Amino acid sequence: MPESSEPAPEIYRLPWPEQFRALADLAQDSRLKSFYQTGCIPADTPMAEAPLVAMDFETTGLDADEHAIVSIGLVPFTMDGIPLGQARHWIVRPRLPLHKTSITIHGITHSDIEKAPDIEEILEDLLDSLAGRIPVVHYRDIERRFLDVALRNRIGQGIRFPLLDTMAIEAHLNPDRRPSRWQRLMGKKPVSIRLADSRLRYHLPHYAGHNALIDAIATAELLQAQIRHHF
């Protein structure tokens, strides 16, 4: 494993476009350098004009230090549409063994990953798909953290990028989603901000979950609905 190098902490306090320029200078891997050199779209870009990419990972668990990515789904989109022909889906071989519980959840088996590439083998395509776009996820602690750890373990440097989190948006829109004990006794029910439940509030169709590409498409549709209804 390459020796990890960590940028100076003050870089992380810079605005994102300046962070990207600084991180491009520090990047030792050509694929990561190219990602940063593409740049970050300005913060004042109207949502109607923003290039976006929905991203979802299926993993062997929830702890990025103990578990690994097994599949990645990406789909570029804008507020005007989702070009499904440009979607990408990879099954990748984790360095850690699959657990029976994770196989039950995402359905990816040992035979599926036996000849699958390591994530480093698809890294150039993955970063090219993300470059110049704002990633959109449903629960940022999975995608950003797992990708950062995966890169640290392979090329010695992690990755940073701004993103939009549809789960965080739902949390903001439903501040009273966890009723008190008294409210529960009075019949008030909690509000789920899970992906499928959030989609139901916007009358979006039900999709089978735990497929990275399907969940990425579902996340793109959810953000479109959130923006149209609330912003």
Residue ranges and their predicted role:
Residues 164-187:
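Short alpha-helix plus adjacent loop in nuclease-associated cores
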Residues 1-43, 172, 200-201, 220-231:
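Acidic two-metal-ion nuclease catalytic site recognized across multiple nuclease folds
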Residues 57-60, 166, 219:
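Ser/Thr-centric signal marking residues that sit
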Residues 19-154, 158-160, 186-206, 210:
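Conserved non-catalytic scaffold segment of RNase H-like nuclease domains
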Residues 215:
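Short, conserved phosphate/pyrophosphate- and ester-handling motifs at nucleotide-, phospho-/glycolipid
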Residues 122, 218-219:
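Short Asp/Glu-rich motifs
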